[in-house]
C-alpha cells in the first residue's frame, strides 16, 4: 500500500492528460507484448534485485509514456524499463493470491485513477472511454497465472505434488509413534499392577473386617459378664436413672467393656489396617459437632473414640456408640428403646395424674423418632434432628421445677430432666442462636400430630402435655393455636393484682408453651365451676388503669406486646446472656426461634390446603351465624348495665353457648383432612379458638369500672408478613391495635358487651376472629388487617377506613352512640386523632349477615345515613356507606393527617412491590 501511495502521489500520472491518452493508445495495441512480459514473472525476484530503486524508476516513467505516443510498438513492448518497473512493483510480494500485491502489480497509467477522499474513502476517476472490459480483466486476472492442474488439490496430492515433509521427517515420526506405543503399553502394565494390588488390599480389608466382627462378638460376650463386676462404677448413673437401672447399665456398660477389650485385641492383632491414632483423631473431628450440639459426653470419651476407630466396619457397634451420645442428651431414649412398657407408662401417667406437663411426655416420642432414624439409616447421622432435639431439652429443663410433682413417677421424671439440665447447661450457650433450632418445628409437627388425638380424651384438667405439643404444631404450620379458650372473656373480678403482676409471664408463656403459664392459668380457673371451663385463659382485669392485652394469644409469628407498668424486660430478645437458671430464659430463646420460623414453608400445597380449610370454615360459620345472630343480639339487650351480678350470669350463659358451638365446629373440622394439619388444635375443655380460623357467635360481657384517665391500649405487633395467594397481607411490621380511649365522660360503672364475634380476620395466613368491639360511650376501634369478606379490597393494600354499622343496643348512663367497624392500618397517633374528633361506640357484627341499625338518642353526625336505615343492610350497602363515611372523614382531616396518609400509602406501595418480588422469588427459589 505504501508503493501505491507513492504512485498516487507521484507527478507522472497527474501531470498531463495527453500522456495518459498516449499510454491508453499503447495499451490498446500492445496486449501480446504485455502478456509476454507477464509470462516472465518467474524471474521477477531476480529482476527486482538487479533493477534500480523505486524512485529512479518513477523518474523514468515520462520517457516511457513518450515512447507510447510514437509509432514504434516493438521497441515500446520490449523495452526492459517497462519490465523492470513491473518487476520492481511485485518484488515485495511472494504470494500471487495476495490482493494488495495484485493491485500493486497491475497498476499502470491506463488503470482508472483513484483520488483520495476524506475519511479513508477513494473515488475512481475514469479518464477515457477507450478501456474495454476484456483489457481490464486481462490486466487484473491474466490467464497464464492459473495453476497448471485442474484443482488446487493437485498441487498437494499426486505425483507432481509438492512434498510437504521430507522422508527423514517421516522416519522420525514413525519412531515417535513406536515410543508412544511403548509408553501406552507400559501404562497398561502399570494399571494392571495397580489393579492387582488393589484386589490384594480389598482381600486384606475383608479379612480385617471379619476379624473385627469376631473381636466384636468376643467383646460383647465379655462385656455382658463385666456388667456385674463393674456394677459399682455405674452407681451415679443409676441414681439419675433410678426408674430402670438395669436398662441403663445394659445400654451403657456393653460399650464400655467393648471399648476396652476391642482396643486390646486390635493392638495384639498381626494385621493393622489403619493407624489407630489417626482414626481416633478423625472420629474426634467428626464427633466434635455432635458433642457441641447435644451436650457434654461422659468420662469414657477417649475410650468411646477408640471403640469407634477399632470397629470401623461394624455398623452395629457404631450404632450403639451413637446411642450413648444420644443418651447423654435424651436420657429417656434408653427407656423407650429397651422397655416399651415403661415408655407407655411414662406417657400415660402424667395424663392420669393432675400434674401438668413433664419432660417425659415429649422426650419418649422424640427419642423414638431418633432411634428409628438411627436404625434405618445405619450410622448415617441425622444432624438436623440432633440439632432439632436440643430445644426439647432446653424447654424441658425448668418445667418440672416450676411446680411440685403430684406422683412419685413425676418425681423420677423430674430427676431425669435435672440430669438433662446439667448436661445441656455447659453447651447451651453456644447454641443460643435461633438458627440452631429452626428444625424444632419440623420435628414437633410430626410429634404433635401423633399426640393430637390424645387431647380429645383429656378433659379433666386444664393443660395436657399434648396441648403444649399442639401449640408447637402451630409453629410448623405458622399458626398459634390457643387450646383452652373459646372466646376472650375479660372479667374484672379476677384478682387484679395477680393478673397485673403476672401478665408478662402469662403472655410470654402462651407464646412459648410454658408450663408455668398453664399452672397459673389453671389456678385462676379452678375457682369456677366445670361449666365455666371454656372461659379464656387470660382472665384479665381491665379494672385497673393498666394496659392489658386483649389478644392475649397472638400468632407465634407475631409478637404480642403488652404495655404493662409491672412488665419486666423478660420479653426482650436481647437478654440472651442472662442466667440459665432463670425459668423464662429458655422460653425467651425458644420464642426468638419461633419468631424467625414464622413464615410458611415455600410450598404451594400447604397454602392451598390452608385456603381450602378456611373456605370450609367460612361456609360452616355462615350457616351457624345466620341461626344465632338474633339470639346474640337478644342476649345483649338482656344485660343489666348497673348489675354486676347480671353481667356474670350473662357471661356464663354466653360462654356455655360459645363452648357448645365451638366444640361442634371444632369436631367437624378436626375430622377433615386439612383440619389436623393446618387449622387448629383444640383442648377438650371446650377450648376456644382464639387464634384459629373462626369464633362462633355469642356475646361476651365485661363489667368494668373505668376512670376518666384510664386508657385501654391493646397493641398487637405482627412481626413478619405473610403471602396469601399473590397478594400481600401483612408486610413489614404493622401494628394491630385495638384502642378503647375514654373521652371526657365521667363513668364509674361502665358496661362493655362484646357481640357478634363471627368475623374471620386474616392474620399471617391464619384467620383470626376477634370479639366484636366495645359498646362504650368512648372511642372504640378494632384495627384488623383483613376481614374475610373484604379480601379483594384489602389485598390490594388500599388505605381502607371502611365502617360497618350494625345492630347495637347500649344502656349507658350518660350517652348512647352507634358503633362502627374500621378496617385500617394507620399509625396510633392518626387513630387517636380521629377518636378525639369522633366519640363513637364501636361494635362489630358478622360481615356476611345482614346488618341492621337501630336509631337511638345522641346519634353521631357521621352515622346519620346509617341510622336512617331501619331495615336490614346487606354487605354491599354497608360497604358503600362505609366508603361515604370515609370520604366525610377525609374531608375533615387536617393537612398533616393527609400528608401522613400519603406517606403511608407510599410505604404500602413500596411494600406491595417488595412483596410481589418476594412472591415471585419462591417460584424460582424452589
Swiss-Prot record:
Modified residues (Phosphoserine): 186, 464, 833
Primary localisation category: nucleus
Bias type Polar residues, positions: 640-653
Biological processes, Gene Ontology terms: DNA damage response; DNA repair; mitotic G2/M transition checkpoint; positive regulation of protein serine/threonine kinase activity; regulation of DNA damage checkpoint; replication fork processing
Coiled-coil segments: 183-214
Keyword DNA damage appears in the UniProt entry: yes
Biased composition (Basic and acidic residues): 72-85, 882-905
Impact after mutating residue 107 to A: Reduced interaction with ATR
RBM1 motif, short sequence motif: residues: 603-618
Protein's UniProt keywords contain Cytoplasm: no
Localization: Nucleus
Glycyl lysine isopeptide (Lys-Gly) (interchain with G-Cter in SUMO2) crosslink location in chain: 85, 414, 442, 480, 507, 533, 535
Domain of life the protein comes from: Eukaryota
Annotated segments matching region Disordered: 1-112, 640-663, 878-905
Annotated consequence of substituting residue 50 to D: In a colorectal cancer sample; somatic mutation
Tissue-by-tissue expression: Expressed at high levels in the brain, liver kidney and Ewing tumor cell lines.
One term under GO cellular component: nuclear replication fork
Keywords attached to this entry: Coiled coil, DNA damage, DNA repair, Isopeptide bond, Nucleus, Phosphoprotein, Ubl conjugation
UniProt short sequence motif RBM2 motif, positions renumbered to this chain: 891-913
Quaternary organization: Interacts (via RBM1 motif) with RPA1. Interacts (via RBM2 motif) with RPA2. Interacts (via the ATR-activation domain motif) with ATR.
PANTHER family registered for this protein in UniProt: EWING'S TUMOR-ASSOCIATED ANTIGEN 1, EWING'S TUMOR-ASSOCIATED ANTIGEN 1 ETAA1
Function summary: Replication stress response protein that accumulates at DNA damage sites and promotes replication fork progression and integrity. Recruited to stalled replication forks via interaction with the RPA complex and directly stimulates ATR kinase activity independently of TOPBP1. Probably only regulates a subset of ATR targets.
Domain notes: The RBM1 (RPA1-binding, also named RPA70N-binding) motif mediates interaction with RPA1. The RBM2 (RPA2-binding, also named RPA32C-binding) motif mediates interaction with RPA2.
Record protein name field: Ewing's tumor-associated antigen 1
Gene that encodes the chain: ETAA1
Amino acid at each position: 500500500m505504501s508503493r501505491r501511495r507513492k504512485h498516487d502521489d507521484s507527478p507522472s500520472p497527474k501531470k498531463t492528460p495527453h500522456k495518459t491518452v498516449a499510454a491508453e493508445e499503447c495499451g490498446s495495441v500492445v496486449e501480446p507484448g504485455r502478456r509476454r512480459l507477464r509470462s516472465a514473472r518467474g524471474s521477477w525476484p531476480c529482476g527486482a534485485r538487479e533493477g534500480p530503486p523505486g524512485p529512479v524508476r518513477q523518474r523514468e516513467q515520462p520517457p516511457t509514456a513518450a515512447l507510447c505516443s510514437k509509432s514504434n510498438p516493438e521497441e515500446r513492448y520490449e523495452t526492459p524499463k517497462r519490465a523492470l518497473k513491473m518487476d520492481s512493483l511485485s518484488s515485495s510480494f511472494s504470494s500471487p493470491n495476495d490482493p494488495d500485491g495484485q493491485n500493486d502489480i497491475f497498476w499502470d497509467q491506463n488503470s482508472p485513477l483513484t483520488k483520495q477522499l476524506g475519511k479513508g474513502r477513494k473515488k475512481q476517476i475514469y479518464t477515457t472511454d477507450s478501456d474495454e472490459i476484456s483489457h481490464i480483466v486481462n490486466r487484473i486476472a491474466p490467464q497464464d497465472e492459473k495453476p497448471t492442474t485442474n484443482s488446487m488439490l493437485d498441487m498437494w496430492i499426486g505425483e507432481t505434488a509438492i512434498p510437504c515433509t521430507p522422508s527423514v521427517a517421516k522416519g522420525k515420526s514413525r519412531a515417535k509413534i513406536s515410543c508412544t506405543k511403548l509408553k501406552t503399553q507400559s501404562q497398561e502394565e502399570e494399571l494392571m499392577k495397580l489393579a492387582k494390588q488393589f484386589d490384594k488390599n480389598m482381600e486384606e480389608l475383608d479379612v480385617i473386617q471379619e476379624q473385627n466382627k469376631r473381636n466384636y462378638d468376643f467383646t460383647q460376650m465379655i462385656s455382658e459378664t463385666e456388667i456385674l463386676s463393674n456394677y459399682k462404677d455405674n452407681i451415679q448413673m443409676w441414681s439419675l436413672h433410678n426408674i430402670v437401672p438395669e436398662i441403663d447399665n445394659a445400654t451403657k456398660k456393653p460399650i464400655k467393656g467393648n471399648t476396652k477389650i476391642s482396643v486390646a485385641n486390635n493392638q495384639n492383632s498381626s494385621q493393622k489396617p489403619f493407624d489407630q491414632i489417626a482414626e481416633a483423631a478423625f472420629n474426634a473431628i467428626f464427633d466434635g459437632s455432635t458433642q457441641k450440639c447435644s451436650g457434654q459426653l461422659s468420662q469414657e470419651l477417649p475410650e468411646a473414640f477408640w471403640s469407634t476407630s477399632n470397629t470401623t466396619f461394624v455398623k452395629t457397634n457404631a450404632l450403639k456408640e451413637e446411642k450413648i451420645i444420644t443418651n447423654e442428651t435424651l436420657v429417656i431414649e434408653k427407656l423407650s428403646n429397651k422397655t416399651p412398657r415403661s415408655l407407655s407408662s411414662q406417657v400415660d401417667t402424667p395424663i392420669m395424674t393432675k400434674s401438668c406437663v413433664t419432660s417425659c411426655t415429649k422426650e419418649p416420642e422424640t427419642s423414638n423418632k431418633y432411634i428409628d432414624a438411627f436404625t434405618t439409616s445405619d450410622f448415617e447421622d441425622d444432624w438436623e434432628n440432633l440439632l432439632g432435639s436440643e430445644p426439647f431439652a432446653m424447654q424441658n429443663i425448668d418445667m418440672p421445677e416450676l411446680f411440685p410433682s403430684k406422683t412419685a413417677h413425676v418425681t423420677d421424671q423430674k430427676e431425669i430432666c435435672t440430669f438433662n439440665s446439667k448436661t445441656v447447661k455447659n453447651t447451651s450457650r453456644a447454641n443460643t442462636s435461633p438458627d440452631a433450632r429452626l428444625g424444632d418445628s419440623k420435628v414437633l409437627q410430626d410429634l404433635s400430630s401423633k399426640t393430637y388425638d390424645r387431647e380429645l380424651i383429656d378433659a379433666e384438667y386444664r393443660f395436657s402435655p399434648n396441648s403444649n405439643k399442639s401449640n408447637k404444631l402451630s409453629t410448623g404450620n405458622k399458626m398459634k393455636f390457643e387450646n383452652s379458650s373459646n372466646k376472650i372473656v375479660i372479667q374484672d373480678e379476677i384478682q387484679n393484682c395477680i393478673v397485673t403482676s403476672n401478665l408478662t409471664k402469662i403472655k410470654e408463656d402462651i407464646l412459648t408453651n410454658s408450663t408455668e403459664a398453664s399452672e397459673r392459668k389453671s389456678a385462676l380457673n379452678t375457682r369456677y365451676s366445670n361449666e365455666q371451663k371454656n372461659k379464656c385463659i387470660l382472665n384479665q382485669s381491665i379494672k385497673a388503669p393498666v394496659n392489658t392485652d386483649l389478644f392475649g394469644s397472638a400468632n407465634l409469628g407475631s409478637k404480642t406486646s403488652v404495655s404493662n407498668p409491672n412488665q419486666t424486660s423478660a420479653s426482650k430478645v436481647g437478654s440472651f446472656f442472662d442466667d440459665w437458671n432463670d425459668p423464662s430464659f429458655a422460653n425467651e430463646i425458644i420464642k426468638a426461634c419461633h419468631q424467625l420460623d414464622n413464615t410458611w414453608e415455600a410450598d404451594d400445597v400447604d397454602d392451598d390446603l390452608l385456603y381450602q380449610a378456611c373456605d370450609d370454615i367460612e361456609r360452616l360459620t355462615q350457616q351457624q351465624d345466620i341461626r344465632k345472630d338474633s339470639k346474640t343480639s337478644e342476649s345483649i339487650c338482656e344485660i343489666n348495665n348497673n348489675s354486676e351480678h347480671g353481667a356474670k350470669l350473662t357471661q356464663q350463659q354466653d360462654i356455655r353457648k360459645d363452648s357448645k358451638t365451638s366444640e361442634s365446629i371444632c369436631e367437624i373440622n378436626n375430622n377433615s383432612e386439612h383440619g389436623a394439619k393446618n387449622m387448629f388444635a383444640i383442648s377438650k375443655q371446650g377450648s376456644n379458638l382464639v387464634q384459629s380460623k373462626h369464633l362462633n357467635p355469642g356475646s361476651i360481657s365485661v363489667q368494668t369500672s373505668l376512670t376518666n384517665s384510664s386508657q385501654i391500649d391493646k397493641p398487637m405487633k405482627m412481626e413478619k408478613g405473610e403471602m396469601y395467594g399473590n397478594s400481600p397481607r401483612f408486610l413489614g411490621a404493622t401494628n394491630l391495635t385495638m384502642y378503647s380511649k375514654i373521652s371526657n365522660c365521667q363513668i364509674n360503672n361502665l358496661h362493655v358487651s362484646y357481640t357478634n364475634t363471627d368475623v374471620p380476620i386474616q392474620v399471617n395466613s391464619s384467620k383470626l376472629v376477634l370479639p366484636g368491639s366495645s359498646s362504650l360511650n368512648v372511642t372504640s376501634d378494632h384495627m384488623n388487617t383483613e376481614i374475610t369478606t373484604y379480601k379483594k379490597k384489602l389485598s390490594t393494600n388500599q388505605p381502607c377506613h371502611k365502617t360497618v354499622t350494625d345492630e347495637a343496643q347500649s344502656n349507658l348512663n350518660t350517652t348512647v352512640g352507634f358503633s362502627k367497624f374500621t378496617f385500617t392500618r394507620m399509625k396510633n397517633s392518626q387513630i387517636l386523632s380521629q377518636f378525639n374528633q369522633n366519640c363513637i361506640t364501636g361494635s362489630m357484627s358478622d360481615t356476611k349477615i345482614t346488618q341492621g341499625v337501630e336509631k337511638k338518642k345522641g346519634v353521631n353526625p357521621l352515622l346519620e345515613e346509617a341510622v336512617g336505615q331501619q331495615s336490614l343492610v346487606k354487605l354491599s350497602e354497608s360497604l358503600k356507606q362505609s366508603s361515604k363515611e370515609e370520604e366525610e372523614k377525609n374531608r375533615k382531616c387536617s393537612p398533616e393527617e393527609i400528608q401522613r396518609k400519603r406517606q403511608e400509602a407510599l410505604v404500602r406501595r413500596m411494600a406491595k412491590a417488595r412483596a410481589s418480588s418476594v412472591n415471585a422469588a419462591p417460584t424460582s427459589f424452589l
